[in-house]
Regions:
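Glycine-rich Rossmann-fold phosphate-binding loop(s) that bind the pyrophosphate
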Residues: 8-9
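N-terminal Rossmann-fold NAD(P) dinucleotide-binding loop
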Residues: 12-13
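Aromatic pocket-lining residues of Rossmann-like dinucleotide-binding sites
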Residues: 19
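Short beta-strand element of Class I
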Residues: 25-26, 94
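Conserved acidic E/D residue at the C-terminus of a beta-strand in Rossmann-like folds
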Residues: 30
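Short alpha-helix immediately C-terminal to the canonical SAM-binding loop
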Residues: 36-37, 104
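Phosphate-bearing ligand-interacting subdomains
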Residues: 42-126, 132, 151
Length: 185
């Protein structure tokens, strides 16, 4: 797939690098020359422009990409303006980062494909990680595969294994369950 990422701060630059490493074509955009310089050899193309300026934005191949991601963080006004300009220019698939509830509410009015809340998602992931890693025993099969034994987290109680979406959400496959002295495979 082909992406434009506008805003190459911490979040946007990691997003650009990771998508590029997965083989996607990434075009990075930022006003900060240093941020663009850091990524120029890691992504397909980069632009040093002010995406809040409609004329500057017109140099980007907006119609030739699958998704435009607005990764601008703390500059609420810039984020909203860029999203509005993208909509005005007929960009079909827009993802935008929201840094708080008000920002998210305003972005929802644009009817975007996705509103990204990385701080919230990171906190939820950490809670799940902490919840799962209480009393974990593991055995490494190879660099990518482990067998892990852990006590059932309280949040799993009352659900069927199929309802937990462990494989889809965490790439975890249940190979056995132990209840009391009984082993279920």
């Amino acid at each position: 797939m082909k992406y434009i990422i506008i805003g190459l701060g911490n979040y946007g630059s990691v997003l650009a690098e990771e998508l590029s490493a997965l083989g996607h074509e990434v075009i990075g955009v930022d006003t900060n020359e240093r941020r663009v310089d850091v990524l120029k050899d890691k992504i397909a193309t980069s632009f040093i422009i002010d995406a809040t300026d409609e004329q500057s934005l017109s140099v980007l191949p907006l119609k030739d990409v699958d998704v435009v991601i607005v990764a601008i963080g703390e500059n609420f006004g810039a984020s909203i303006r860029v999203v509005a300009l993208l909509k005005k220019n007929g960009v079909k698939h827009i993802y935008a980062r929201a840094v708080d509830e008000v920002h998210k509410t305003v972005l929802e009015a644009f009817n975007l494909d996705s509103i990204l809340t990385p701080e919230e998602e990171a906190a939820r992931s950490l809670v799940q990680l902490l919840d799962l890693h209480v009393n974990v025993e593991s055995f490494e099969i190879d660099e990518e595969h482990y067998v892990m034994k852990f006590k059932l987290p309280g949040s799993f109680v009352g659900y069927k294994v199929s309802d937990l979406s462990l494989e889809k959400e965490f790439n975890i496959k249940i190979i056995a369950l132990v209840k009391g002295c009984l082993l279920y495979t």
